[in-house]
Swiss-Prot record:
Record's protein name: Acyl-[acyl-carrier-protein]--UDP-N-acetylglucosamine O-acyltransferase
Root EC class: transferase
One GO-annotated biological process of the protein: lipid A biosynthetic process
Task performed by this protein: Involved in the biosynthesis of lipid A, a phosphorylated glycolipid that anchors the lipopolysaccharide to the outer membrane of the cell.
Assembly and interaction partners: Homotrimer.
EC identifiers of the protein: 2.3.1.129
Cellular component, GO, one term: membrane
Amino acid sequence: MTLIHPTAVIDPKAELDSGVKVGAYTVIGPNVRIGANTEIGPHAVINGHTTIGENNRIFQFASLGEIPQDKKYRDEPTKLIIGNGNTIREFTTFNLGTVTGIGETRIGDDNWIMAYCHLAHDCVVGNHTIFANNASLAGHVTVGDYVVLGGYTLVFQFCRIGDYAMTAFAAGVHKDVPPYFMASGYRAEPAGLNSEGMRRNGFTAEQISAVKDVYKTLYHRGIPFEEAKADILRRAETQAELAVFQDFFAQSTRGIIR
């Protein structure tokens, strides 16, 4: 059963599945679709061509699907797509995509987005991530699965953060962060392996050791980057835990943190 507070303003063209709850003074626009059992708190605003999946919890004052902060945007019907089972806390802002990007901003499943986080246009966020308070992504950023962003992390346009990576408090990410690695600092630098995150997600000691050797190959052995990359890609053909480096290196355009 859908429960809508009488003060909520919902366009008649919006589509709300069964079990959706909408709090007081929330505003939902005409091109919004919301999946079953999603709960939206008071004073939220959901606009644009926005599709939200099932079993999400969206807290008060979230702003989802507003136009991108891009001067080139001309009211094109770009999209925001949010998956299932996400927690989106207070004062978060997720913008629509742009026609000069991929045309949509996408968030996967089971993500935990804390208060005041910002996802700009054309960002792609995977599954099972954690964004601590005030983490912000500039446009066209890609974040992999199981990533943890420390509070006040800022990620520059077009950067890529690999699966299981982690950033420290107030990290300024201006280059790509490889999978499994930690990054810290105003101009983020490599800060070791996210070994605790790997253990919590079921990686064996042998697998963690293999990734640690990749870290040493990239940063501690004095090997030129292209040679180190080729060596890692060779190992990735036979070691499953290293397979994520294949896509990461193929898609990386800004170079990696050094």
